[in-house]
UniProtKB/Swiss-Prot annotation:
The gene is pgk. Its main location: cytoplasm. Substrate binds at D21, V22, N23, R36, H59, F60, G61, R62, R119, R152. GO terms for biological process: gluconeogenesis; glycolytic process. Monomer. Belongs to the phosphoglycerate kinase family. Disulfide bonds: none annotated. It holds the Pfam family PGK. ATP binds at K202, E324, G354, G355, D356, T357. Keywords: ATP-binding, Cytoplasm, Glycolysis, Kinase, Nucleotide-binding, Transferase. It comes from Cereibacter sphaeroides (strain ATCC 17029 / ATH 2.4.9). One of its GO terms (molecular function) is ATP binding. Pathway: Carbohydrate degradation; glycolysis; pyruvate from D-glyceraldehyde 3-phosphate: step 2/5. It is found in: Cytoplasm. This is Phosphoglycerate kinase.
Length: 397
């Protein structure tokens, strides 16, 4: 699969419509975490360097096709200006029609224009061809730098890419390269770590992975469901007992595909779910009836350590235990730090994604050591599920 990048495009003197993700958290009208804004800077600066005029398109929140003042991208303007010091950043109060048309016409080389929330128009989420055509009128080239919105076929992600010469921005390019290295044409053996609470939310993911990876590590609450499927009692632990048949199907599918599934060998149990709760480590088959499993134990960590050490590629989505609360973060921390260490030593390509995963790796102090950490959430999951992402498919040449 190939796609054009900024290196393939002649941008001199052209208005470049750039789909970005600036859907940042806000409190009292202030941006509390500008990470997503900072990530688009390389693309914007590259376009400026090539003599293009970047016009930014983005959504913000879920206004459902209506104008909602608290979801205006005007609120993001100060943080965007701060991320681009020395560059004039202007704002237009719509993303189609006379206002942005006039603002684009008035742009000088070296300036950036931010357009209003695309989701203020009901046609955005319906991928309305008329809205996409009205957006396309504003520029000569389209660049998608929002991998996080690539799983949605919207006017500004998919419709627009069909109407103008299109390329991937630097963030999108980095994401696609990392994902291609991890699951497209990976170096083997490939290990996937999948954690989290529920099997039901990750059925497609598990089903796709067993056919594509050599080892599948299952952790978190969903491991309990697999234990139940094998006739093991898990006390008061979180488990989806109605998913036991499905778990057994996944186990047999894995066996047929030659994928080894790793479940906890020992577990850390407690009677209450709170920081510093009295806890003990027991064999997986010996969970007391009045206790709940909150983490994988040291035997499990040691066994996984051997699996990781023999791997060449690792993909991670979801923690191995209740990482938010000490001491039930021990297995996740130990595994994350080892993966980071192997990656730094050049022995492993490691790609991680999903909100909880990123939080867990940051908490463990291991995030910096991974080859690539995706901030994309839903798009990362759908990519891991083997689904086509409309925003990426539209860029494919």
């Amino acid at each position: 699969m190939g796609w054009k990048t900024l290196d393939d495009m002649d941008l001199a003197g052209k208005v470049v419509l750039v789909r970005v993700d600036v859907n940042v958290p806000m409190e009292n009208g202030e941006v509390t975490d500008a990470t997503r804004i900072e990530k688009i800077v390389p693309t914007v600066e590259d376009i400026l360097k090539k003599g293009g005029k970047p016009v930014l398109l983005a959504h913000f929140g879920r206004p459902k096709g209506k104008v909602v003042d608290e979801m205006s991208l005007r609120l993001v303007l100060p943080a965007l200006q701060k991320a681009l010091p020395g560059t004039k950043v202007s704002f237009a109060a719509d993303c189609v029609g006379p206002e942005p048309e006039q603002a684009v016409a008035a742009m000088l080389e070296g300036e950036v224009l931010l357009l209003e929330n695309t989701r203020f128009h009901a046609g955005e989420e319906k991928n309305d061809p008329e809205l996409a055509a009205a957006m396309a009128k504003l520029g000569q080239v389209y660049v998608n730098d929002a991998f996080s919105a690539a799983h949605r076929a919207h006017a500004s992600t998919e419709g627009l890419a069909r109407l103008l010469p299109s390329a991937a921005g630097r963030l999108m390019e980095a994401e696609l390269k990392a994902l291609e290295a991890a699951l497209g044409h990976p170096e083997r053996p490939v290990v996937a770590v999948v954690g989290g609470a529920k099997v039901s939310t990750k059925l497609d993911l598990l089903g796709n992975l067993v056919g594509r990876v050599d080892h599948l590590v299952i952790g978190g609450g969903m491991a309990n469901t697999f234990l139940v499927a094998q006739g093991i009692e898990v006390g008061k632990s979180l488990a989806e007992r109605d998913m036991a048949d499905t778990a057994r199907e996944i186990l047999s599918k894995a066996k047929a595909a030659g994928c080894t599934i790793h479940l906890p060998l020992d577990v850390v149990v407690a009677r209450e779910f709170k920081a510093g709760a009295a806890n003990e480590t027991v064999e997986t088959s010996a969970c007391p009836a009045d206790a709940m499993i909150l983490d994988a134990g040291p035997k499990t960590v040691a066994a996984l350590s051997e699996v990781f050490a023999s791997a060449k590629t690792l993909i991670w989505n979801g923690p191995l235990g209740a990482f938010e609360i000490e001491p039930f973060d021990a297995a996740t921390n130990a595994a994350a730090l080892q993966v980071a260490q192997l990656t730094k030593a050049g022995q492993l390509i490691s790609v991680a994604g999903g909100g909880d995963t990123v939080a867990a790796l940051n908490k463990a102090g291991a995030a910096e050591g991974f080859s690539y950490i995706s901030t994309a959430g839903g798009a990362f999951l759908e990519w891991m599920e083997g689904k086509e992402l409309p925003g990426v498919a539209a860029l494919t040449v």
